[in-house]
From Swiss-Prot:
Described purpose of this protein according to its UniProt entry: Electron carrier protein. The oxidized form of the cytochrome c heme group can accept an electron from the heme group of the cytochrome c1 subunit of cytochrome reductase. Cytochrome c then transfers this electron to the cytochrome oxidase complex, the final protein carrier in the mitochondrial electron-transport chain.
Protein name: Cytochrome c
Database matches in InterPro entries: Cyt_c-like_dom, Cyt_c-like_dom_sf, Cyt_c_1A/1B
Family affiliation: Belongs to the cytochrome c family.
GO CC annotations, alphabetized: cytosol; mitochondrial intermembrane space
Keywords on record: Acetylation, Electron transport, Heme, Iron, Metal-binding, Mitochondrion, Respiratory chain, Transport
Gene3D superfamilies per UniProt: Cytochrome c-like domain
Domain of life: Eukaryota
Gene: CYC
Alphabetized SUPFAM superfamilies for the sequence: Cytochrome c (SSF46626)
Annotated GO MF terms: electron transfer activity; heme binding; metal ion binding
PTM info: Binds 1 heme c group covalently per subunit.
Protein localization: Mitochondrion intermembrane space
Annotated heme c binding sites: 15, 18-19, 81
Length: 105
């Protein structure tokens, strides 16, 4: 798996404008990601998801996030996440390592 510290830097640069990770964190443009691993798409309480997100029906984990974060709109056509994705697999692995750590605390 990736490097948590490198992943934190990637999160701050590319994700934190729209997402929070801490327990009880507020939703921004995107949902709070606390408890992400093991949760189905479109299930963060209190966030308004597109039908595409709600109906995707996968459970978030290392493999699903690796594919999603490469090209979100390809993985979930109709998502309102406007992020283009992270092409480098090593950067995605670092981000996932950080998310796995930060969203479980």
């Amino acid at each position: 798996m990736g490097d948590v510290e490198k992943g934190k830097k990637i999160f701050v640069q590319k994700c934190s404008q729209c997402h929070t990770v801490e327990k009880g964190g507020k939703h921004k443009t995107g949902p709070n990601l606390h408890g992400l691993f093991g949760r189905k798409t479109g299930q963060a309480e209190g966030f308004s998801y597109t039908d595409a997100n709600k109906n995707k029906g996968i459970t978030w984990g290392e493999d699903t996030l690796m594919e999603y974060l490469e090209n979100p709109k390809k993985y979930i056509p109709g998502t309102k996440m406007i992020f283009a994705g992270i092409k480098k697999k090593s950067e995605r692995a670092d981000l996932i390592a950080y998310l796995k750590d930060a969203t479980a605390k």
